[in-house]
């Protein structure tokens, strides 16, 4: 069983927006990425410059941050259990990636300002940014995306959208905690440094590459996390 995985973080300063943009475009050092494969990453949506994209959206909506620590953008990391990608062709990975941008565009419209597909780490994933402008013109992360109910609804709707790829949502109302993006990266960083063969999704290929098969350390590490996550949920819903 493979899970759809979505994490949401807060970018509450222009410095953090710039840092996220640098991470996405690999203009800053990224310890868990393979520099030899960074040219395989793809900007799926929006401009390369994340800071400019956020500023342009705020200007277009006529919104100015009211507080010094206002959340300027929500940062998404969208991925799936590592074993989901094991037998996928480059075309199938790109189809999955396109599903991420379709979901975000339908849900957040013009507030969805950037998405980047990373293929230089052990497991493909998409980083995306959404400016949290409410329908009544406020910059309000909690009302727009945050809060327990909003995040629960996001997880449910995202998993439904990913059902087409055979991905499932975890059990709702469980004791399993939502992990922040930093926690998610921290738990898998050591395993993600395991070298993996290169894959390029752009050219046509005649057969599926086995580019994740040597990343056994990564797969086993994350499978164990997913299993613990599922066990905790199942325990929580026992009568």
Model region roles, listed by residue range:
Residues 1-239:
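N-terminal nicking endonuclease/strand-transfer module with a His-rich metal-binding environment
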């Amino acid at each position: 069983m493979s899970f759809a995985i979505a994490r949401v973080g807060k970018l509450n300063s222009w410095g953090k927006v710039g840092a996220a943009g640098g991470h996405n475009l690999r203009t800053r050092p990224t310890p868990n990425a393979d520099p030899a494969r960074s040219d395989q990453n793809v900007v799926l949506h929006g401009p390369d410059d994340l800071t400019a994209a956020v500023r342009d959206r705020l200007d277009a909506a006529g919104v100015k941050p009211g507080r010094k620590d206002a959340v300027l953008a929500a940062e998404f990391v969208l991925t799936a259990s590592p074993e989901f990608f094991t037998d996928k062709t480059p075309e199938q990975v790109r189809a999955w990636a396109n599903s991420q941008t379709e979901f975000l565009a339908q849900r957040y419209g013009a507030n969805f300002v950037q998405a980047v597909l990373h293929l230089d780490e052990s497991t493909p994933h998409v980083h995306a940014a959404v400016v949290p402008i409410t329908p009544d013109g406020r910059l309000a992360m909690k009302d727009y995306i945050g809060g327990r109910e909003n995040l629960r609804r996001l997880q449910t709707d995202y998993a439904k959208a990913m059902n087409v790829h055979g991905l499932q949502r975890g059990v709702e109302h469980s004791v399993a905690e939502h992990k922040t993006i930093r926690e998610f990266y921290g738990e898998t960083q050591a395993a993600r440094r395991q070298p993996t063969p290169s894959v390029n999704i752009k050219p046509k290929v005649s057969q599926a590459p086995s580019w994740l098969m040597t990343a056994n350390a990564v797969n086993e590490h994350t499978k164990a996390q997913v299993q613990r996550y599922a066990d905790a949920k199942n325990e929580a819903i026992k009568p």
